[in-house]
């Protein structure tokens, strides 16, 4: 995890996730639903473009999409710092840990209810002490079919149906 190389960091996070399991009796909730509920009256920041982005935009008062790729509806990067200082909800892709940007986002939005989202989310309770409120990631429950899908070059969206379980862990339950 201390490497400067993205691939090495990814392997470190994957290894970490194999050794840490979220508590078994978590409420059944999705990251996008939590963000919609928490963001209905304020400003929501979503770092990374997710399949639920358009739906979330309809469910919150204001959605700011922080995305480096030029996608429709993204917020210009020169506005990010100001928005982070006042947002009420912050959704971060777990990839921000790999790119070394997570700490910066957490420091600039200490007031925000923060959800870390996606298959690269480290399911480590350490993140709760650094500002995360919810860890919404995934675990492999059927390794054989998932590994076969990876070997065949399937995308995550394709092989997740083969044996991936989505999990969400709230700091309120620890």
Where do the PLM segments sit?
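Histidine/lysine/aspartate-rich catalytic loop segments that bind and position anionic ligands
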Residues: 52-83, 88
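A short acidic, amphipathic alpha-helical/loop segment
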Residues: 55, 59, 101-108, 126
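Active-site glycine-rich loop that binds ribose-phosphate moieties when present
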Residues: 26-32, 69-79, 97-99
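Conserved acidic residues
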Residues: 42, 88, 133
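A short helix->loop->beta-strand "cap" motif at the edges of active sites that frequently abuts
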Residues: 61, 109-113, 132
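C-terminal functional extensions of proteins
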Residues: 115-174
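Structural motif
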Residues: 45, 89-93, 115
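Electropositive, gly/pro-rich neighborhoods at or near active sites that engage anionic ligands
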Residues: 1-51, 150, 167-174
């Amino acid at each position: 995890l201390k490497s400067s190389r993205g691939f090495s960091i990814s392997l470190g996070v994957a290894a970490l996730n194999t050794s840490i399991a979220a508590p078994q009796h978590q409420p059944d909730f999705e990251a996008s639903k939590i963000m919609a509920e928490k963001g209905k009256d304020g400003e929501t920041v979503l770092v990374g473009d997710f399949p639920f982005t358009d739906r979330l935009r309809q469910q919150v008062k204001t959605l700011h999409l922080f995305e480096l790729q030029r996608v429709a509806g993204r917020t210009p990067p020169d506005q990010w710092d100001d928005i982070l200082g006042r947002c009420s909800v912050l959704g971060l892709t777990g990839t921000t840990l790999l790119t070394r940007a997570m700490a910066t986002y957490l420091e600039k939005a200490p007031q925000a209810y923060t959800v870390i989202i996606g298959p690269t989310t480290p399911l480590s309770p350490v993140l709760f002490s650094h500002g995360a409120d919810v860890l919404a990631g995934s675990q492999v429950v059927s390794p054989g079919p998932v590994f076969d899908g990876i070997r065949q070059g399937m995308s995550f969206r394709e092989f997740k149906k083969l044996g991936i379980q989505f999990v969400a862990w709230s700091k309120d339950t620890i």
